[in-house]
Amino acid sequence: MIDPDGFRPNVGIILTNDAGQVLWARRINQDAWQFPQGGINPEETPEDALYRELNEEVGLEREDVEILACTRGWLRYRLPQRLVRTHSQPLCIGQKQKWFLLRLISNEQRVRMDLTGKPEFDGWRWVSYWYPLGQVVTFKREVYRRALKELAPRLLARD
């Protein structure tokens, strides 16, 4: 599902632990790290997609997490031209994302990245809240900055 402007609806997941660190996941067979994220299917709400992606990508269920906050609007990024599939219709030029800030309320041993036939990640670690800004691929950096900045007060408010 791609909107009329060429952006694919998507959810981004910032999963925190009790120390305020965030789960940082390594893309399979790559030295590239990112937050879990994934597309919203036509029949899904962003929250439905959040729970589906959370399970597919990190093996967690609804009862393993608490939603602390969600971005108010959609945050967009454009794909670099080399990643745009110019022969696909409709043409997708980027993603528009709703970002969710979650707190892990179960044991971190429940995190599993091998539950699907095609896992997206092969490793993970806890990092400081702002660490991803200096590490994520350049074209996603501004969306990460905006999401982290908007959601940070909600993380701090629970302390």
Curated annotation (Swiss-Prot):
Q: Provide one Gene Ontology biological process annotation.
A: mRNA catabolic process
Q: What is its EC number?
A: 3.6.1.-
- Enzymatic class: hydrolase
Entry's Gene Ontology cellular component terms: cytoplasm
Entry GO MF terms: mRNA 5'-diphosphatase activity
Q: Where is the Nudix hydrolase domain?
A: 6-149
Q: Which UniProt keywords apply?
A: Hydrolase
Which cofactors does this protein require?
A: a divalent metal cation
Annotated InterPro entries: Nudix_hydrolase, NUDIX_hydrolase-like_dom_sf, NUDIX_hydrolase_CS, NUDIX_hydrolase_dom, RppH
**Position of motif Nudix box?**
38-59
> Which family does the UniProt entry place this protein in?
Belongs to the Nudix hydrolase family. RppH subfamily.
Role of this protein: Accelerates the degradation of transcripts by removing pyrophosphate from the 5'-end of triphosphorylated RNA, leading to a more labile monophosphorylated state that can stimulate subsequent ribonuclease cleavage.
* Name the UniProt record assigns to this protein: RNA pyrophosphohydrolase
Organism encoding this protein = Pseudomonas fluorescens (strain Pf0-1)
